[in-house]
């Protein structure tokens, strides 16, 4: 989804603005809207010919919107129909981009529901921790990505793992990702969800790795320092790695701030060798 260009990028931005306007209303159930958008995503993923018709540049935006309204009018709420109709009115560079966009809107709606309940921070942290669990547990990853396992079996496994321990939003997001990966790896999907969660508060995400857990004071100071450097609020995803001999390693996007003893030793070794 981050790979959208040109018309699709503009269309996605417009769709996100429409979604934000809708979910700002207290009368809109963001969680239910997420379910409906996810159902439309699944439909268009399956029905390639329909997807192509709804993104055909030779058809007027109004004609495509009317088609979406006829097809979905009795299947989902009026709010969901209006949002999808507005989305297909836009021009899309590729038909797949429309499906990616609707999936992203579903995820944002779920995150908005969590934000309204004051639980967004919990969801962000749980997504990060689940990603770490997946990266260190090859058996669990294999079970969740197995092509031979049924959707029901994967959902049941996730319910057992997350149901009583995690936020409902976290379970919903991860279950959708696992049961409908649409060609993505589990890791990249979780990373995308984490970025969306951070975007809900217009924050950047810093992955902080330290040899020992940071104190609350250290976390607050680091967050404030990074916010000052980057000019935006910063959410810290914390990880402990005993192999980091001391100090802290911080990664923000593709940028790595090397402040650990291990890095300083490696830099010193390179200087001696040169």
From Swiss-Prot:
- Short name of one Pfam family for this protein? OSCP
Gene Ontology process terms (BP): proton motive force-driven ATP synthesis
Q: In the record, what terms sit under GO molecular function?
A: proton-transporting ATP synthase activity, rotational mechanism
Keyword Glycosyltransferase among UniProt keywords: no
- Primary localization: membrane
Protein location:
Cell membrane
Write the signal peptide boundaries.
none
Instruction: Tell me how this protein sits in the membrane.
Output: Peripheral membrane protein
Keyword list (alphabetical) reads: ATP synthesis, Cell membrane, CF(1), Hydrogen ion transport, Ion transport, Membrane, Transport
InterPro entries assigned: ATP_synth_OSCP/delta_N_sf (IPR026015), ATPase_OSCP/d_CS (IPR020781), ATPase_OSCP/dsu (IPR000711)
Naming one, the record's GO cellular component terms include: proton-transporting ATP synthase complex
* Gene3D superfamilies linked to this entry: N-terminal domain of the delta subunit of the F1F0-ATP synthase (1.10.520.20)
Family per record: Belongs to the ATPase delta chain family.
NCBIfam families assigned:
ATP_synt_delta, PRK13430.1
Assembly description: F-type ATPases have 2 components, F(1) - the catalytic core - and F(0) - the membrane proton channel. F(1) has five subunits: alpha(3), beta(3), gamma(1), delta(1), epsilon(1). F(0) has three main subunits: a(1), b(2) and c(10-14). The alpha and beta chains form an alternating ring which encloses part of the gamma chain. F(1) is attached to F(0) by a central stalk formed by the gamma and epsilon chains, while a peripheral stalk is formed by the delta and b chains.
Q: What does this protein do?
A: F(1)F(0) ATP synthase produces ATP from ADP in the presence of a proton or sodium gradient. F-type ATPases consist of two structural domains, F(1) containing the extramembraneous catalytic core and F(0) containing the membrane proton channel, linked together by a central stalk and a peripheral stalk. During catalysis, ATP synthesis in the catalytic domain of F(1) is coupled via a rotary mechanism of the central stalk subunits to proton translocation. This protein is part of the stalk that links CF(0) to CF(1). It either transmits conformational changes from CF(0) to CF(1) or is implicated in proton conduction.
Q: What is this protein called?
A: ATP synthase subunit delta
This chain's source organism reads Streptomyces coelicolor (strain ATCC BAA-471 / A3(2) / M145)
Upper lineage ranks?
Answer: Bacteria, Bacillati, Actinomycetota, Actinomycetes, Kitasatosporales
């Amino acid at each position: 989804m981050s790979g959208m260009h040109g018309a699709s990028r503009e269309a996605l931005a417009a769709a996100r603005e429409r979604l934000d306007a809708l979910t700002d209303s207290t009368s809109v159930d963001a969680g239910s809207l997420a379910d409906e958008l996810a159902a439309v995503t699944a439909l268009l993923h399956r029905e390639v010919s329909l997807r192509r018709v709804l993104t055909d540049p030779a058809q007027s935006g109004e004609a495509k919107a009317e088609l979406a309204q006829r097809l979905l009018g009795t299947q989902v709420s009026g709010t969901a129909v209006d949002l999808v109709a507005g989305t297909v009115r836009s021009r899309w560079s590729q038909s797949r981009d429309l499906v990616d966009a609707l999936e992203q809107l579903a995820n944002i709606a779920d995150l908005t529901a969590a934000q309204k309940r004051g639980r967004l921070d919990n969801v962000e942290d749980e997504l990060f921790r689940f990603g770490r669990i997946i990266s260190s547990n090859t058996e669990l990853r294999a079970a969740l990505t197995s092509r031979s396992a049924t959707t029901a079996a994967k959902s049941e496994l996730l319910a057992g793992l997350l149901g009583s321990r995690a936020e409902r939003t976290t379970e919903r997001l991860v279950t959708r990702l696992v049961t409908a990966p649409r060609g993505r790896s589990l890791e990249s999907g979780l990373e995308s969800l984490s970025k969306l969660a951070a975007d809900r508060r217009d924050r950047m995400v810093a992955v902080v790795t330290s040899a020992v857990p940071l104190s609350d004071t250290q976390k607050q100071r680091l967050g404030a320092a990074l916010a000052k450097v980057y000019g935006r609020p910063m959410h810290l995803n914390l990880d402990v790695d005993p192999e980091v001999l001391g100090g802290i390693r911080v990664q923000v996007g593709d940028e790595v701030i090397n402040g650990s003893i291990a890095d300083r030793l490696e830099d010193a070794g390179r200087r001696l060798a040169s």
